[in-house]
């Protein structure tokens, strides 16, 4: 079982040497040459510096296509027409599974076709120099966004290629994404990624790391998401990471989302060591979207309003075409502009929402209880503790496909649309907190004239895509049972 100890320089070099032959572009990686390339970049392309010095939330979309020139064109469009402050490069699914041969076939097919045969940018196949061409061609900093349980070679190639931010982590890119990777193995893989980022940082090239906050993206209780962020942050900090962006995915209730983002920042600064700079990122709604673009814009606007009130350091935007899959560049840019409009109109207003302090206090209590259980499960070692906590169910993620998590915890919304826990299973929360959740869900059940049941859970999963927040019986979102004018 891995422990939360820093990899030695010899261990880092040995693993890197073993990885070089996994695909031929791995042999292009030269650390000293990479340092020199990063040092040649202007301040405007240094991700951590741009993010950490901003005085309002920065916007970043998701975007990735197979071919280099098309990826450059896409990101330039989002930069120039969408006003993106930070840019992404989303990696394809074959690369996420380390299937570089299949990625190569898809890249070759895409080059000879008007169709994209991959759902992202195969950075390992492109290699170091193509990555540098991408970085040189753009004005804004660029982040690697992927979903890869074993991202070691991807990190080697992209960091050498000039990327200065790398998303993911051993829990957030395992539990929500895959069945076939055990948590101990992904922790070991990500210790290498984080140590590599730390090695760059120690040479004056700060690599920003961003754990994936939304997890499964489906009604994740805030305290569970924040606990995972803190664990991944601690693991990264041990390996020398000094710029950490902790993530959170919108659940849809404005008060709860603002409270959660404030709790995330506060607890991040509390649990992570002093030399770490903590920033936060807010992901606009990651669940199902309405098929109608006008309604989808309403969902995006709620995300923008939430960001204006909570003021995270970064917002990952969505488009009105989420329902149909990968959006057009025009729709992606429009999502950026919609979010920016909401933020710019609201950010200077003094908006006082009742209930935020109480909700934040509850989230913090829950998160501390989960963190205490993790430390106890590992006798103070966070790596061992999180493995044991997931194994026992003391920590869990709803709707997770991974065999490393029990997936027994179930959420549902209360009468205000805040995400509560309907089924706790073995989650390590005290009885008085469980009673609060049960009481809030009981109020909703009374309003709706039905018993608390799994039907509530299922109704809530589909509610926003159906044009509501709460999955009321019969599709009626009015607590009083009146007719809805939404259809």
Swiss-Prot record:
Pfam families from the UniProt entry: Met_asp_mut_E
- Positions binding adenosylcob(III)alamin in this chain are 64, 119, 176, 289, 318, 322
Residues in a coiled coil are none
What GO annotations for molecular function exist for this entry?
cobalamin binding; methylaspartate mutase activity
Residues annotated as binding L-glutamate are: 62, 96, 145-146, 167, 173, 177
Q: What is its EC number?
A: 5.4.99.1
Q: Taxonomically, which superkingdom? A: Archaea
Q: Which cofactors go with this protein?
A: adenosylcob(III)alamin
What keywords are assigned to this protein? Cobalamin, Cobalt, Isomerase
What is the reaction catalyzed? (2S,3S)-3-methyl-L-aspartate = L-glutamate
For this chain, the family text in UniProt reads: Belongs to the methylaspartate mutase GlmE subunit family.
According to the record's subunit comment, the protein's assembly and interactions are: Heterotetramer composed of 2 epsilon subunits (GlmE) and 2 sigma subunits (GlmS). GlmE exists as a homodimer and GlmS as a monomer.
Q: What is this protein called?
A: Glutamate mutase epsilon subunit
